[in-house]
Amino acid sequence: MNAHATPIHDPTALHAWVVALAHELGFALVGVTAPAESSRAAALRAWLDAGKHGEMTWMAETVEERCDPRRLLPSVASIICVADRYHDGSRDCEQIAQEPSEARGRIARYARSKDYHNLVRDRIHKLRHAMQKRFPDASFRLTGDIQPLMERDVHQAAFNGQIGKNTLMLVPGEGSWFVLGELHTSLVITPSTRPPAWNRDDPCGSCTRCIDACSTGAITPFSVDASKCIAYLTIEQRGTIGPEFFGAMNGWIFGCDDCQTVCPHCQPKKRRAVDERMGSVAARYEERLNSVPLLELLGWSEEDRARLIMSSALKRATLAMMKRNAVVLLAEHAAKHAATCEAIEARLRSLQLDSTEDEVVREQCAIAIAWLASQRA
């Protein structure tokens, strides 16, 4: 990595140096902003008060830190925001499974490669190391989506993107297929400026495709009820999935991309590709696993889980959660394909009666069996 030899003290020159370093490290987007309380702090508190965070109690416990990044690093003067493109927007080939053994659960695209947390964090560490070497007295702190920070707000302030109606950060004309990371520093760096191509504050206009595509009704303009979101239900919720969501999971076993795949900005043929870095997907995000066989998953051991998914973001879901999700999807499959219903229901009954199985999985089987009976009534 070329760290450039000239010492830098001017905030504007430092901005150019940091952006060059980050691009050398392969980041598609780089922006800088000054720390400030989030403009959506009141909206976040109202969202929490309404219980739309579901079981994610840690969000309420860290609300003050989330709303003001200065609480994460008191000496912070600048936040460097970086992002990677992890998908080009192309659609998956639809495969219609008729037999239970063919039924598979889809994985959200960000979780199909190696764990993006590591892919982003490792290079932010390199960025920090280069900056610390040049400025040994400066303070730094890395953040990502596991720290209490409204990071999409911060990236919007750094002009990396704009927040869409589905609450994801999207780049106008390029979409929302980006994973984010940040480096907070005590160094004063000139903030980024608004790109000339951004000719509106609202990137969505009258479009409601993401809202219309959400099968659980989780999305309203610029807000998502996490307790109804498929991504939350399959990844964050620890208990059973209620029968009100059966028939709406759309084959997703981990996460959901439905609100992105319909977004006009996310379509590969419509992307502007103004910047090659922004438009291309690095080899580090090569897909390794895009779906899993549902019946086979019900027989997984902890060793199977570790072997197949522990190097990816899939590890966020426990084995019991993955099995729970598979139970729901198998019930949906049985409801659509009557010829498979008897075999799937027999497997679910067997799992429900297995005293060695996790209680949540057994309870989910009972819910699924009752739901299938209601579909026949």
Where are these regions (language model features)?
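Short, hydrophobic/aromatic alpha-helical segments in well-folded domains
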Residues: 127, 199-203, 215, 248-249, ...
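Flavin-dependent oxidoreductase catalytic cores
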Residues: 194-195, 199-209, 219-221, 315
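Auxiliary alpha/beta "docking" domains used to position bulky ligands
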Residues: 1-202, 241
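Alpha-helical scaffold domains
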Residues: 243-377
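Short gly/pro-enriched beta-turn/loop segments at secondary-structure junctions
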Residues: 163-164, 172-173, 178, 207-208, ...
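Iron-sulfur cluster-binding cysteine motifs and their immediate structural context
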Residues: 27, 209-231, 238, 252-278, ...
